[in-house]
Amino acid sequence: MELSEIKRNIDTYNEKLEQLRGSLDLEAKETNIQEYEEMMTDPTFWDNQEKAQDVIDKNNALKSVVNAYRTLESELEDMDTTRALLLEEDDETMKQDLEQSVQDFKNELDQFELQLLLDGPYDANNAIMELHPGAGGTESQDWTNMLLRMYQRYCEQKGFNVEIADYLPGDEAGVKSVTLIVKGHNAYGYLKAEKGVHRLVRISPFDSSGRRHTSFASCDVIPQFNNTEIEIDINPDDITVDTFRASGAGGQHINKTESAIRITHHPTGIVVNNQNERSQIKNREAAMKTLKSKLYQLKIEEQEQEMAEIRGEQKEIGWGSQIRSYVFHPYAMVKDHRTNEETGKVDAVMDGDIGPFIEAFLRSQMDQHENEG
């Protein structure tokens, strides 16, 4: 790479950073950080633990953006300084290092832009993910279990913490339903891309004739809301609370007492199970939190539907649509039908390498919003 080309790249990156700076309002973010950190020094800060954690999470999110921008800004200055030195002194090792830095910087800038795409009102929240098999018994239940492992591996790679809140094993293999609580900054922002129906085509391990089978599983994802974010009043007369014995994922943590909780909300028909805690009280608290999140999400969707009707828009039912196909036979291919992102590395995808699909979806959403704007 010639120095003139390196300069063009640096100038392009500089221009991009300036554009981002204009939309980021860094000064306002830094002011907010100062305000949050002053709040954290207050002796009464931890009196309300949920509110305190909310402040800490918001502060960390702001610092993550500001620090990432400042780091990019500093790296770009260093690269330009090195380029200027190379104009005066021909040093091949220094030039190779600079070329590598320029290439690395592009990847860092792409990742930073991706981080900025997660600016929805609840993108920073934890996520509640539910997986359900389609028709087909053992075939689709096994496919649901494969998706469960895929998401567990992806979350592990992202540094997210995954709790299995509810797990109903399949009759012979796989899983009939599973609910995950995924905790981590931007968990919902990333995982919302997975909402929809996932299709598998393979030679069935359960078919002695070795025939090809197609299986389906649905993935639903909503944000987990904190009590500080929402106000949802639930009338005790509207719910029924039942207890049952926890089954446990893979037969683990099976309770001998009925500590698992099922809450049925009669006006909406929403049913929430929680069994990963050791006591009825904690399972009830967790189940109520999930129920409130679902009711609030329902409220948001109703408002969005009303606005869509006012604007005369036809809104597609998101989770009921097929979003991705995983073909194991007669060829190997995973393809996202929303973005046309595809790969032949099926094993890597099933081992959690779904980042490219999620990134492509987020970028397509950004492009769509820009076109609408």
From Swiss-Prot:
Pfam families: PCRF, RF-1
Record bears the keyword Oxidoreductase: no
Coiled coil feature spans: none
Superkingdom per UniProt: Bacteria
Misc note: The gene for this protein contains a UGA in-frame termination codon after Leu-24; a naturally occurring frameshift enables complete translation of RF-2. This provides a mechanism for the protein to regulate its own production.
Protein family according to the UniProt entry: Belongs to the prokaryotic/mitochondrial release factor family.
Post-translational modification: Methylated by PrmC. Methylation increases the termination efficiency of RF2.
Species per Swiss-Prot/TrEMBL record: Staphylococcus saprophyticus subsp. saprophyticus (strain ATCC 15305 / DSM 20229 / NCIMB 8711 / NCTC 7292 / S-41)
Protein name: Peptide chain release factor 2
Keywords: Cytoplasm, Methylation, Protein biosynthesis
Lineage: Bacteria, Bacillati, Bacillota, Bacilli, Bacillales
Biological-process GO terms, alphabetical: viral translational frameshifting
A GO cellular component annotation in the UniProt record: cytoplasm
Role this protein plays: Peptide chain release factor 2 directs the termination of translation in response to the peptide chain termination codons UGA and UAA.
Subcellular location: Cytoplasm
InterPro entries referenced in this protein's UniProt entry, alphabetically: PCRF (IPR005139), Pep_chain_release_fac_I (IPR000352), Pep_chain_release_fac_I_sf (IPR045853), PrfB (IPR004374)
N5-methylglutamine, modified sites: 252
Entries under SMART domains matching the protein: PCRF
